[in-house]
A protein has these predicted regions:
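Conserved catalytic core of sirtuin-type NAD+-dependent deacylases
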Residues: 2-221
Length: 221
């Protein structure tokens, strides 16, 4: 056990040294970054994929564009129960916010929880959107997640009575092109890429790592 602990400690020291000498850092994070905040990931044994609930459909169906269109009421019932939480930033979020104050750091996240910004990070690229942003599909009026959470059944716009849709990338929907290109540019410019909390199974987000031409990649899982 002592040798394993020594190895872990040495890796931490090595990572700190890499961070110290790097000029442009990209942190590329997935669901595992937020599990310490109590948010379910997707593929672990306790994640959404293996969730046994009152819903008969798997999570990727419940969170698909076609399900949103065809079963809007049930979509929002599921979405409000599992996607909108009272989670708070954990130590990883807080450390990255602290690091941003002294280093040129870009955070690229596949998460939609908005916890990086809550921790204080400014330079965050959200590949799959955020639960914090919701817009009327008719007039475009903005609503926060509390309005969605507190709405009865389907959330409707106070101005025009249109349905409000979360600004998140559902299954069957393309990733926001602007966010993807911005993330690609950040990775192309970086000399240190830190990948954490992701299995790199989700396309096209996983293709971004092929645009890294820097010196060091660190994988934390």
């Amino acid at each position: 056990m002592g040798s394993i602990m020594d190895l872990e400690e040495s890796k931490i020291i090595e990572l700190k040294n890499l961070i110290k000498k790097s000029k442009k850092i990209v942190f590329f994070g997935g669901a595992g970054v937020s599990t310490e905040s109590g948010i379910l990931d997707f593929r672990s044994k306790d994640g959404l994929y293996n969730l046994k609930s009152k819903y008969d459909e798997p999570y990727e169906v419940m969170l698909s564009h076609s399900y949103y269109e065809e079963n809007t009421k049930t979509f929002f019932e599921f979405y409000k129960e599992f996607m909108i939480t009272s989670a708070q930033p954990n130590e990883a979020h807080k450390y990255l916010a602290y690091l941003e104050k002294s280093k040129d750091l870009t955070i690229i996240t596949q998460n939609i929880d908005g916890l990086h910004q809550e921790a204080g990070s400014k330079n965050v690229i959200e590949l799959h959107g955020s639960i914090k942003r919701n817009y009327c599909t008719n007039c475009g009026k903005f609503y926060n997640e509390k309005y969605i959470k507190n709405s009865k059944d389907i959330p409707f716009c106070e101005t025009c009575n249109g349905i409000i849709k979360p600004d998140v990338t559902l299954y069957e929907e393309p990733v926001n092109e602007y966010a993807f290109l911005k993330a690609r540019f950040a990775i192309e410019q970086a000399d240190l890429l830190i990948i954490a909390g992701t299995s790199l199974n989700v396309y096209p987000a996983n293709s971004l790592i092929y645009y890294f031409y820097g010196d060091n990649i660190v994988l934390i899982n």
